[in-house]
């Protein structure tokens, strides 16, 4: 049952093959037996109670396609009455008094929350090794990383521990783990999904999205997650289309742009071969391929690692050991309380980024670093605008390599370089997606799709058409 999609499980409920309670218990048993370390908190009692409500809804004829579907929620979304840690010691004891808007929306359609997934601390990381709760393992090979920061979410879907999961993407944190774990993940246009109650890392870059088995499932979940929210000042008041409507549209005549900068040195040969094979599949469906250029792509990493740390140093200043969160014991005075609570509560990578951000925002350096980074960010955005005048969608790799060994990358800069292909979509606020497109070294490879603003329907249509022609998304890890 753990390989079934949302559509297949909903049909199973309809045909009375199993009840919501039975399905939920099945998933809870799988989580209990798993050693992927994908979950921080398992909400078994809550899940079974929600499943019973869902069964009642189905029996009364008031169900929707998502009623009773078990999912995993990234532990960055506030959940009323349930621990919300963001993968940090700082929030290890924090129980949210309210629901994030995303949590609220998912509750309204009677989904079943199995638990909160493991993640890089405060979403800062590309390997899910930066969690206070330990590293997450890749279901395809337990010695490999699952990607980050939504590694627990990706591992839970790929490992058959949930039907789908929520994720967040600040610089690739949905797309990269989706790619490395062989699942489907979409980061919509900035402002499409409310950030209210989603613990902030970098406010101008953060965006939530679904992580699923298929593009069709992603469309179904995005229908619920998307929408304007007056509680979020960055939320855009734009009507949400039904993302399932155009899934079956023909993609004949689609113009695909391949940025030459995506295929330069540093890209693994086997990964490149898989990407080009996927592009040929689209050509066989009638798509047209053009080479394009994003000349400022090389600056995406330095720009991101100025802008994001600056925003995080401001956002995380609220965690001081006074109002909530970790508080150091036996402190001498208020200054000692701040100093020790933050130094003991935050992990190494979070402290590194706070320090970088505080330095870049300090007097005398603001113009040289932060202001300059924002100017180059606009240049990167302009590159995309010019490219989308000629094409419909950008395609390329998500990550330069497949999943690397746990503990093998010690140098932070080497870790940052792995984000080269994903960061630019966040800097420009564009929608991006990863879909399974093959294997290299027996590990999944994801194809990245980047669209123009508000083109989620088109991306999902393109992805769905690819999945009708290929079976990469149907592959499951032997360990699971």
Curated annotation (Swiss-Prot):
Keywords: ATP-binding, Ligase, Nucleotide-binding, Protein biosynthesis. Its EC number is 6.3.5.7. GO terms for molecular function: ATP binding; glutaminyl-tRNA synthase (glutamine-hydrolyzing) activity. Gene3D superfamilies: Amidase signature (AS) domain. InterPro entries: Amidase (IPR000120), Amidase_CS (IPR020556), Amidase_dom (IPR023631), AS_sf (IPR036928), GatA (IPR004412). GO terms for biological process: translation. The keyword Ligase applies. One of its GO terms (cellular component) is glutamyl-tRNA(Gln) amidotransferase complex. It catalyses: L-glutamyl-tRNA(Gln) + L-glutamine + ATP + H2O = L-glutaminyl-tRNA(Gln) + L-glutamate + ADP + phosphate + H(+). Pfam families: Amidase (PF01425). The active site is at residues 74, 149, 173. Heterotrimer of A, B and C subunits. Belongs to the amidase family. GatA subfamily. Allows the formation of correctly charged Gln-tRNA(Gln) through the transamidation of misacylated Glu-tRNA(Gln) in organisms which lack glutaminyl-tRNA synthetase. The reaction takes place in the presence of glutamine and ATP through an activated gamma-phospho-Glu-tRNA(Gln). This is Glutamyl-tRNA(Gln) amidotransferase subunit A. The lineage of its organism: Bacteria, Pseudomonadati, Pseudomonadota, Gammaproteobacteria, Candidatus Pseudothioglobaceae. The gene is gatA.
């Amino acid at each position: 049952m753990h390989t079934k999609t949302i559509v297949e499980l909903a049909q199973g409920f309809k045909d009375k093959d199993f009840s919501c309670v039975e399905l939920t218990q099945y998933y809870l048993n799988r989580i209990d037996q798993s050693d992927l370390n994908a979950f921080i908190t398992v909400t078994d009692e809550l899940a079974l109670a929600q499943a019973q409500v869902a069964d009642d809804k189905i029996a009364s004829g008031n169900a929707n396609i998502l009623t009773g579907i078990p999912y995993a929620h990234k532990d960055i979304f506030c959940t009323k009455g349930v621990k919300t840690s963001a993968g940090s010691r700082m929030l290890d004891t924090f129980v949210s008094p309210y629901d994030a808007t995303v949590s609220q929306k998912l509750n309204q359609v009677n989904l079943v929350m199995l638990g909160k997934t493991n993640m890089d601390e405060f979403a800062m990381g590309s390997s899910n090794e930066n969690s206070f709760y330990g590293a997450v393992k890749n279901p395809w090979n337990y010695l490999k990383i699952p990607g980050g920061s939504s590694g627990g979410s990706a591992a839970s879907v790929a490992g058959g521990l949930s039907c789908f999961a929520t994720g967040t993407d600040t610089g690739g944190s949905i797309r990269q783990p989706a790619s490395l774990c062989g699942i489907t993940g979409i980061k919509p246009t900035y402002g499409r999904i409310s950030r209210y109650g989603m613990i902030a890392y970098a406010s101008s870059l953060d965006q939530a999205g679904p992580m699923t088995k298929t593009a069709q499932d992603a469309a179904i979940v995005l229908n619920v997650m998307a929408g304007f929210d007056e509680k979020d000042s960055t939320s855009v008041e734009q009507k949400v289309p039904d993302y399932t409507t155009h899934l079956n549209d023909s993609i004949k005549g689609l113009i695909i742009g391949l940025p030459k900068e995506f295929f330069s040195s540093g890209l693994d040969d086997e990964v490149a071969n898989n990407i080009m094979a996927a592009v040929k599949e689209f050509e066989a469906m009638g798509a047209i391929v053009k080479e394009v250029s994003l000349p400022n792509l090389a600056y995406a990493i330095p720009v991101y690692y100025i802008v994001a740390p600056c925003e995080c140093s401001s956002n995380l200043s609220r965690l001081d050991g006074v109002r909530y969160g970790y508080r150091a014991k036996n402190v001498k005075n208020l200054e000692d309380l701040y100093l020790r609570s933050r130094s003991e509560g935050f992990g190494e990578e979070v402290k590194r980024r706070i320090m970088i951000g505080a330095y870049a925002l300090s007097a005398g350096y603001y113009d040289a670093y932060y202001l300059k980074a924002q100017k180059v960010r606009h240049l990167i955005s302009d590159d995309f605008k010019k490219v989308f005048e000629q094409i419909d969608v950008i395609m390329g790799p998500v990550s330069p390599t497949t999943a690397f060994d746990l503990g093998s990358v010690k140098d932070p800069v080497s870790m940052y370089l792995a984000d080269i292909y994903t960061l630019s979509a966040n800097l420009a606020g564009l929608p991006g997606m990863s879909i399974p497109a093959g294997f290299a070294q027996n590990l999944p490879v994801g194809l990245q799709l980047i669209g123009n603003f508000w083109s989620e329907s088109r991306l999902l249509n393109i992805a769905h058409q690819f999945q009708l022609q290929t079976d990469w998304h149907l592959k499951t890890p032997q360990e699971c």
